[in-house]
Curated annotation (Swiss-Prot):
GO terms for biological process: glutaminyl-tRNAGln biosynthesis via transamidation; mitochondrial translation; regulation of translational fidelity. The keyword Ribonucleoprotein does not apply. Keywords: ATP-binding, Chloroplast, Ligase, Mitochondrion, Nucleotide-binding, Plastid, Protein biosynthesis. This is Glutamyl-tRNA(Gln) amidotransferase subunit C, chloroplastic/mitochondrial. InterPro entries: Asp/Glu-ADT_sf_sub_c, GatC. It comes from the Eukaryota. Pfam families: GatC. It comes from Populus trichocarpa (Western balsam poplar). It is an enzyme of class 6 (ligase). Belongs to the GatC family. This protein may be expected to contain an N-terminal transit peptide but none has been predicted. PANTHER family: GLUTAMYL-TRNA(GLN) AMIDOTRANSFERASE SUBUNIT C, MITOCHONDRIAL (PTHR15004:SF0). The keyword Mitochondrion applies. It catalyses: L-glutamyl-tRNA(Gln) + L-glutamine + ATP + H2O = L-glutaminyl-tRNA(Gln) + L-glutamate + ADP + phosphate + H(+).
Length: 141
């Protein structure tokens, strides 16, 4: 008592309407019954129709109130869209930890001695050798 779903696609790109055949194998009938479903593209980018929550509940043999049917519809749509996102092939995308991956864009920091040290010390309001004292920037309370 199981079901198998086969998605048939024609051509290299996915069509606007794809055809899904559901084969129901039952012990009672010798030949499997075939039901045909078509899927349509929707405005939100998903290629599947909105879920029929009432039919899903009947198939799962659970009872839902009309409010629960309305509540679970968008949630089931999110799960379907998430699984569609997981099927995206990312093998051709190189892994990265940040957007800037072109290498070392910073100059080398080479220490240099400033020639006119006394002019800087004269311009600073508070100086204690060898430090320049500045007012606190962060107030820690």
């Amino acid at each position: 008592m199981g079901s198998r779903a086969v998605l048939l696609l024609k051509g290299p790109s996915p069509p606007k309407h794809s055809i899904l055949f559901l084969l129901n194998h039952k012990k009672i009938s010798p030949a499997p019954s075939i039901r045909r479903f078509t899927t349509k593209a929707t405005a939100n980018g998903s290629s599947l129709e909105p879920p029929d929550v009432a039919r899903l509940a009947e198939t799962a043999r659970i009872s839902l109130t009309p409010q629960q049917v309305e509540e679970f519809g968008p949630k089931i749509r999110q799960v379907i869209d998430w699984h569609a996102l997981l099927s995206v092939d990312l093998d051709s995308v190189e892994p990265s930890i940040r957007a800037d991956t072109e290498g070392d864009n910073l100059r080398h920091d080479n220490p240099e001695t400033f020639e006119n040290r006394e002019a800087i010390i004269a311009a600073v309001p508070n100086y204690e050798d060898p430090y320049v004292k500045v007012p606190k920037v962060l107030n820690k309370e």
